[in-house]
From Swiss-Prot:
SAM-dependent MTase C5-type domain: residues covered: 79-387
Organism whose genome encodes this protein: Lactococcus lactis subsp. cremoris
Keyword Transcription in annotation: yes
Main EC class the enzyme belongs to: transferase
UniProt GO MF annotations: DNA (cytosine-5-)-methyltransferase activity; DNA binding
Protein name, entry field: Type II methyltransferase M1.ScrFI
Underlying gene: scrFIAM
Length: 389
């Protein structure tokens, strides 16, 4: 890195700092976002202090970093949606891709997810949904949301709406009851069906039926719709029997039956900071040997360009990356990069990642398989478009 004259250095340091502040990013977040090596935040701090000067390539990377949200609402969109437990907006993105749906309300509590959401959609989600009166939520055609898997009270034998109080699913149910959206899409882990000996899933379905919605469910893997990931989730779609005439016409999308390949999401050149250390690699190998000896199936998993798909990307991936490690020739394996994690969930290349690598892994691990959402959204819109009510 070269030392520069005071005037030029001052101009560049001011430009970098002003850009970073406009983006509402820390030095660490900006360094990770533009693909700098380990300790990139220290480098940016030196640039901002005028101690050293970035190369033309580095300046260009910072200047090119987008400041305008790429997925703002389309003004011509016909249908309105709300996005609950929104995360970074993966479900909203799937509906946005239909070009027929715009968001009028969203809710999320994680400050880092909110930052990513705002950078991409241009609007900031409201906070804690439990503190928002359902009457204050705008009218909408479609409600979407993912919610944590929680056991319900078993006070009543019916297992319906009243039994859901005190859970985050209740927040969804009370909004559906008050606002009567034409349709909804809920996403959850596949274990929802067996959680609490099946009572949780039964209570959810009973509650939605009680609210007079026609309900459809399906299990899909991310690779069913073109992603090289084995992530399996349950999808619950509902239509208001009172306002949709053809609610029984809905059919879940058909899986593509296409072979996937991990190489399709991998970058050709990856910074060494993603290669795991000797200490971590030794630990992974030791634990795998111990687990095998004790009859446990847990441990790291290696993948390469030709692997058909990876394990499920989880929110804990930032810790050690053991569930998805990429083989490297004559080197320790590496973790996937945040951009590769985004691709593994089907996020487009222009999706902005304005947070640190650690937060990015959490966010994509907590998000949804966007192509699956898009496929279901198109099928839902077919029904809404043909409804005669």
């Amino acid at each position: 890195m070269t030392t520069i004259s005071r005037n030029t250095g001052t101009e560049i340091s001011i430009m970098i700092k002003e850009k970073r502040l406009r983006l509402n990013m820390t030095q660490k977040e900006l360094a990770d976002a533009v693909g700098m090596s380990k300790n990139g935040d220290r480098t940016i701090r030196r640039w901002e202090n005028g101690e050293t000067c970035p190369s033309q390539l580095e300046i260009s990377a910072i200047l090119r970093f987008p400041e305008i949200a790429p997925f703002e609402n389309r003004k011509t969109a016909k249908y309105k949606m709300i996005d609950l437990f929104a995360g970074i907006g993966g479900t909203r993105l799937g509906f946005h891709q239909t070009e027929k749906v715009k968001s009028v309300f969203s809710s999320e509590i994680d400050k880092f997810a909110i930052k990513t959401y705002k950078a991409n959609f241009g609007d900031e989600p409201h906070g804690d949904i439990t503190k928002i009166d359902e009457k204050d939520i705008p009218d909408h055609d479609i409600l979407v949301g993912g919610f944590p898997c929680q056991a319900f009270s078993q006070a009543g034998k019916k297992l319906g709406f009243d039994d859901t109080r005190g859970t985050l699913f209740f927040e969804i149910a009370r909004i559906i009851k008050e606002k009567r959206p034409k349709a909804f899409l809920l996403e959850n882990v596949k274990n929802l069906k067996t959680h609490d000996k099946g009572r949780t899933f039964k209570t959810i379905l009973n509650t939605l039926e009680e609210l007079d919605y026609e309900v459809h469910t399906a299990l899909f893997k991310a690779r069913d719709f073109g992603l090289p990931q084995n992530r399996e989730r349950i999808y619950i779609v509902g239509f208001d029997r009172k306002s949709i005439s053809n609610y029984s016409d809905f059919q879940m999308p058909t899986p593509l039956q296409e072979k996937t390949r991990v190489g399709n999401i991998l970058e050709s050149v990856v910074d060494d900071k993603y290669t795991i250390s000797d200490k971590l690699w030794d630990g992974h190998q030791r634990r795998k040997t111990e687990n095998k000896k004790n009859g446990k199936g847990f441990g790291y998993t290696l993948f390469n360009q030709d692997s058909e798909y990876t394990n499920t990307l989880s929110a804990r991936y930032y810790k050690d990356g053991s569930e998805i490690l990429i083989e490297q020739k004559n080197k320790n394996p590496r973790k996937i990069t945040p951009r590769e994690a985004a691709r593994l969930q089907g996020f487009p290349e222009n999706f902005i990642i304005p947070v640190s690598d650690t937060q990015a892994y959490k966010e994509f691990g907590n998000s949804v398989a966007v192509p699956t959402i898009h496929a279901i959204a198109e099928k839902m819109l077919e029904v809404l478009e043909k409804s005669k009510k």
